[in-house]
């Protein structure tokens, strides 16, 4: 099969478009002929080399993918050859206490497709059948791949962990990334009022086009927490979605008393200082999560395929141009998701 892989960690130059053996499905697995894959910042982190990451080289990037089942392993009864599917990249073992209590994103032997398991920058991939969602006949593969990881991540964080409710005000820090564009739509779907803080006027305008009510340009408002206080009549917001990390100090300031800070990542940096006095004096909660449960994935994909949530695709590259796609992602030029077209 054709694939894009790397044989050593490094910059985009280590990515190689080449032939690689097509995998064969084991018991409980299916082989998918992929039609689309979607990029995540994790792809670049893995390519560069996480400290302590353990994976088999050569490695294939890619958590998100959608396509058609072309072969079945033994003991697969819920799907058939020809089914159109999208992949849930959140791999639990299916056996531990967390998986058995339907908290598979907390699995004791948790893996993410494309991180420690060869992923979707390829013509074919094998995955357990429990990781699949069956797509309607005409639903677009690229939209499916663009939705899978970011929508389940944002849904689990905002709905199941954060408890965002209609009438609340949610501030989303950053305009452009896949999780944040999903978060804007999910917050609006839930009936919340949305403030987006960003530094790019074009991306802020695009955020408004998908539902943002108030835009704050942090390149003009260095202390944007004050701008949020003014916008909320000195009350503060109920919820801040902050996946940057280094912006936590201002996010804590922007929250009302009893507010919640939700986080699923740290695109800025993993280590930074915060003032604990804001947390205990304002009765704040910091709520982290990773990915979602299988039930959350099905729930949010139901909303996607019925058009209640609409994935934003920034640009599509041919598979062989994955390096250029990653460079665009890393430069932060995208609004929404970048996808790969797989022949």
Region roles according to the model:
Residues 174-175, 266:
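NAD(P)H cofactor-binding loop motif with strongest signal on the N-terminal glycine-rich segment
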Residues 21-37, 50-100, 126, 136-138:
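Glycine-rich beta-strand-centered segment in the early N-terminal region that forms part
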């Amino acid at each position: 099969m054709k694939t894009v892989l790397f044989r050593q960690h490094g910059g985009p130059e280590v990515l190689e478009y080449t032939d690689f053996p097509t995998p064969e499905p084991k018991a409980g697995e299916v082989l998918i002929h992929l039609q689309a894959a979607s990029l995540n910042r994790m792809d670049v982190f893995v390519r560069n080399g996480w400290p302590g990451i353990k994976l088999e080289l050569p490695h294939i990037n890619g958590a998100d993918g959608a396509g058609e089942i072309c072969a079945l392993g033994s003991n697969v009864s819920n799907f058939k050859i020809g089914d159109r599917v999208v992949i849930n990249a959140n791999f639990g073992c299916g056996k531990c206490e967390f998986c058995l209590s339907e908290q598979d994103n907390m699995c004791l032997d948790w893996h993410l497709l494309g991180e420690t398991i060869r992923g979707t920058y390829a013509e074919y991939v094998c995955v357990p059948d429990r990781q699949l969602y069956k797509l309607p006949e005409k639903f677009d593969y690229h939209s499916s791949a663009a939705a899978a990881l970011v929508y389940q991540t944002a849904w689990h964080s905002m709905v199941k962990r954060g408890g965002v409710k209609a009438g609340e005000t949610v501030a989303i820090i950053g305009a452009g990334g896949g999780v944040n564009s999903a978060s804007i739509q999910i917050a609006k779907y839930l009936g919340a009022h949305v403030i987006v803080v960003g530094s790019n006027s074009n991306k802020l305008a695009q955020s408004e086009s998908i539902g943002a009510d108030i835009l704050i340009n942090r390149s003009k408002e260095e202390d944007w927490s004050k701008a949020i206080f003014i916008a909320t009549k000195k009350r503060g917001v109920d919820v801040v979605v902050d996946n940057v990390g280094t912006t936590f100090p201002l996010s804590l300031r922007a929250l009302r008393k009893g507010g919640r800070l939700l986080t699923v990542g740290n695109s800025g940096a993993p280590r930074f200082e915060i003032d604990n006095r804001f947390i205990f004096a304002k009765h704040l909660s910091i709520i982290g999560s990773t990915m979602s449960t299988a039930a959350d994935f099905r729930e949010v994909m139901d909303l996607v395929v019925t058009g209640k949530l609409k994935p934003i695709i920034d640009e599509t590259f041919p598979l062989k141009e994955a390096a250029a796609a990653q460079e665009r992602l890393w430069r932060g030029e995208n609004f929404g998701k970048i996808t790969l077209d797989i022949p």
